[in-house]
């Protein structure tokens, strides 16, 4: 039996093992451990001869946690030592996990009662839903700290005077956005053409004139000019200046002289201050010759507009031997080009009037014009509206009675539970005090609403120790699966006291998972678990990895925005597919399918597909892709842009796939400096690094996963050789090199100019697992990983529990996590089944 199989059977057998007394556990340590970990030897600076059955101290809890983890991982006893009988090892693990769980339970009334604050995303979503507004609030708030990789951890979500100040500003912004200030705006459909005089002036001057041609009102782009189309920007911005709000945007576009190809273009939301666009609304594929109309919805603030930009058009023209400067004499276009006929906007779009947010705040209280605009409303937009015909404000004939009625309706939804008179009293006091000072009804009510949105009951998830009551359970479930407060259906279940019933909890879980709002869970969970939020944190060296960049004009290059977005969307669609179809979560490790578009398929060297939309495809035979570990998103966030590190990628796999956290490096460990000359591989450097005995034990775990992924470069591409810019002579001495040329083709793409790198030393993706099994490359490594389905399932369960509850799991939770993983295993490790197992567990339903 291999050591890996022994380890897997050991873990599965732990659940069946009878829990021994401490004397039995102690005999195991004396027989198999004390030779290396007694008072005299203390290998790894770890001593076991003083261990007792009492785990009250932090050191004792940590030491027993370490023993359980290392025995479970197969790290101990060391490979050269005889394995203890499996039954004995199972008994020790059973004792250790039981003792750790018992100690964790005794702590429950102490450190585990910390209240969790809403993080920035949850605050924004909750306020937007409560007031039915589409206003950005997250960026107004301080960045949340993370713990165990998640920004939902209660211990990391502190609050400071700065937070309070920013919450007040955010509350004011949201409340003003919810207010109805005038009659319902007329829904206008307006079409903007490129024959506007300002556009004509623009096209007759400036350095980009040679790359764009206007013919019969259609502008034709022959290059990625980076132009932000000032006429469209100015015309549309002047429109949104008068009427900010939700709009439907349509763009009519086509590909000219296509010859079977189509041009992809992006639509971004932009403003005068950010002319290059700050939010990509979508990517679209312009069909050949006959225009198509593309439609999106977005919310425009004042003066905002859109930017249209062709994608990789320079490459397409160059591959056809075409210049980016077409004739300017009005003759037919030469070569492939993007034609934009018009841009149309429809809006502002409102479902009802007064808006839902206004009704939530002021109900049916009559609206009357201000006689004079109060100071808190003196803004350019409202001043202009007031001068044109007045700005409306709620006016109550019975302000105190209306205030109580409105607050009684608003407060339970804000608090996410029923409220008492005592809950209501401080807000009524705010209103009464303002009214006594002769402030208007609106100002008094907005002051009370702002206080609600900054109150601890709103900002924190209030949960008493022990089993969660139905309203606390509703909040935990909703913030887990929808990333916002409970909706009416869920809140009504809690009001009736039904949610704790297993069948009702399962039904509501299914409803939320089937809702479009579950996309918020997928996006945020993967952003944190897989580190997708760091996708823009590094930039691959453009001279070494030119495939990752696109030409913007001349010698200017920029990161390929479509490939970055495609990386992230591939991971999200992959996870969503598993979740919605209850497919085995083990396909997160390896699969024979993924999601790609034309750009991603080319980047992965897969059979071509057409268009910018991602779709599910089967991987070709022999593909090195499959599962999340070999997706471009994960490979990019685990590299620094210049080089890869087996240590970084290895730690990522251990922590996020296997749930094993290596010990921090000792102070004398030193660091590994990159060899930019390429004359020494990272494996050779690590071999020297491991000569430090205190480093070697951890690197035996860390390095193998990292070595398996060395066949992928910092941009996420497959490679057989390292790329280098320097040290050519030293490399040649070890491996003959081809001569550098002035033009080379990299995976189908021409890179113009002098060669900026040479193939370096060959990549070695071989390695040995801690348990002795050998592998060559990522595919063999993934097959070895899949021999530990329980560990993989338990790790993901722990990540979900941490994300959902705001509390990091530890060794005291291993028994509960083992039970969750075993439950999912009876349902073929289905991802949806795992979600249900997590939600019905005590870890989720208890504080």
Model-derived regions: residue spans:
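Sec-dependent signal peptide recognition
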Residues: 1-9
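Boundary at the C-terminal end of the N-terminal hydrophobic targeting segment
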Residues: 15-19
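Low-complexity, glycine/serine/threonine/alanine-rich intrinsically disordered linker
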Residues: 20-41, 46, 59-66, 70-75, ...
């Amino acid at each position: 039996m291999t050591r890996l199989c022994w380890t897997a059977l050991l873990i599965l057998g732990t659940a069946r093992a009878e829990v021994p007394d401490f004397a039995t556990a102690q005999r195991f340590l004396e027989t198999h451990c004390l030779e290396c970990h007694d008072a005299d030897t203390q290998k790894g600076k770890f001593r076991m001869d003083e261990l007792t059955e009492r785990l009250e101290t932090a050191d004792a809890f940590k030491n027993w946690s370490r023993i359980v983890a290392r025995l479970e991982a197969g790290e101990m006893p060391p490979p050269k030592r005889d394995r203890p009988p499996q039954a004995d090892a199972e008994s020790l693990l059973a004792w250790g996990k039981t003792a750790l769980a018992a100690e964790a339970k005794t702590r429950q009334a102490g450190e585990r009662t910390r209240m969790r604050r809403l993080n920035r995303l949850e605050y924004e979503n909750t306020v937007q839903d409560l007031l039915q507004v589409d206003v950005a609030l997250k960026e107004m708030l301080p960045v949340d700290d993370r713990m165990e990789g998640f920004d939902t951890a209660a211990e990391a979500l502190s609050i400071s005077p700065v937070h309070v100040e920013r919450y007040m500003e955010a509350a004011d912004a949201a409340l003003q956005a919810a207010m109805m200030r005038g009659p319902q705006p007329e829904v206008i459909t307006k079409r903007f053409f490129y024959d506007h005089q300002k556009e004509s002036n623009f096209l007759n001057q400036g350095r980009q004139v040679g790359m764009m041609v206007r013919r019969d009102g259609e502008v034709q782009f022959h290059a990625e000019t980076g132009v932000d189309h000032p006429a469209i920007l100015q015309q549309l911005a002047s429109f949104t200046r008068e009427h900010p709000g939700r709009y439907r945007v349509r763009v009519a576009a086509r590909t000219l002289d296509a010859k079977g190809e189509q041009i992809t273009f992006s639509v971004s939301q932009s403003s005068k201050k950010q002319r290059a666009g700050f939010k990509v609304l979508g990517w679209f594929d312009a069909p050949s010759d006959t225009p198509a109309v593309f439609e999106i919805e977005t919310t425009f603030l004042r003066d905002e507009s859109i930017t249209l930009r062709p994608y990789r058009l320079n490459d397409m023209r160059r591959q056809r031997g075409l210049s980016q400067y077409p004739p300017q004499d009005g003759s037919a276009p030469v070569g492939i080009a993007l034609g934009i006929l018009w841009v149309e906007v429809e809006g502002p779009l409102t479902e009802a009037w007064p808006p839902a947010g206004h009704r939530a705040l002021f109900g049916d209280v009559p609206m009357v014009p201000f006689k004079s605009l109060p100071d808190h409303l003196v803004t350019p937009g409202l001043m202009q509206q007031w001068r044109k015909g007045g700005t409306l404000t709620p006016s109550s004939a019975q302000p105190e009675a209306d205030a109580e009625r409105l607050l009684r309706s608003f407060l339970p939804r804000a608090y996410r539970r029923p409220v008492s008179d005592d809950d209501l009293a401080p807000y009524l006091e705010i209103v009464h005090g303002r009214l006594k000072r002769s402030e208007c009804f609106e100002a008094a009510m907005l002051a009370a609403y702002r206080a609600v949105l900054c109150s601890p009951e709103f900002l924190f998830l209030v949960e008493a120790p022990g089993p969660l009551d139905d309203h606390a359970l509703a909040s935990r479930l909703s913030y887990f699966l929808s990333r916002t407060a409970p909706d009416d259906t869920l809140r009504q279940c809690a009001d009736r006291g039904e949610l704790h019933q297993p069948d009702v909890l399962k039904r509501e879980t299914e409803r939320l998972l089937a809702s479009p709002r579950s996309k918020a869970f997928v996006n945020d969970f993967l952003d944190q678990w897989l580190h997708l939020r760091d996708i823009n944190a590094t930039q691959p060296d453009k001279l070494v990895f030119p495939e990752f960049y696109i030409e913007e004009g001349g010698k200017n290059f920029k990161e390929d925005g479509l490939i970055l977005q495609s990386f992230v969307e591939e991971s999200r669609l992959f996870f969503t597919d598993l979740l919605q179809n209850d497919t085995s979560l083990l396909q997160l490790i390896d699969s024979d399918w993924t999601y790609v578009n034309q750009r991603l398929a080319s980047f992965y060297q897969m059979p071509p597909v057409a268009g910018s939309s991602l779709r599910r495809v089967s991987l070709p035979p022999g593909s090195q892709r499959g599962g999340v570990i070999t997706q471009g998103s994960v490979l990019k966030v685990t590299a620094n842009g210049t080089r890869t590190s087996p240590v970084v990628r290895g730690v990522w796999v251990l922590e996020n796939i296997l749930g094993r956290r290596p010990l921090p490096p000792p102070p004398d460990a030193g660091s590994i400096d990159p060899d930019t000359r390429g004359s020494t591989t990272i494996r050779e450097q690590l071999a020297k690094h491991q000569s430090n005995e205190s480093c070697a034990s951890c690197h035996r775990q860390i390095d193998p996963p990292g070595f398996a992924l060395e066949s992928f470069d910092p941009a996420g591409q497959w490679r057989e050789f390292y790329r280098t810019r320097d040290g050519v002579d030293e490399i040649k001495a070890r491996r003959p090199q081809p001569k550098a040329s002035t033009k080379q083709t990299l995976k189908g793409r021409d890179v113009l100019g002098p060669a900026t790198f040479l193939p370096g030393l060959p990549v070695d993706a071989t390695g040995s697992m801690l348990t002795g099994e050998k592998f060559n490359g990522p595919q063999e490594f993934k097959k070895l990983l899949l021999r530990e389905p329980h560990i993989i399932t338990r790790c993901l369960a722990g990540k979900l529990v941490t994300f959902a509850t705001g509390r990091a799991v530890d060794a005291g939770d291993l028994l509960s996590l083992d039970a969750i993983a075993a439950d999912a295993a009876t349902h073929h490790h289905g991802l949806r089944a795992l979600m249900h197992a997590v939600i019905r567990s005590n870890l989720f339903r208890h504080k």
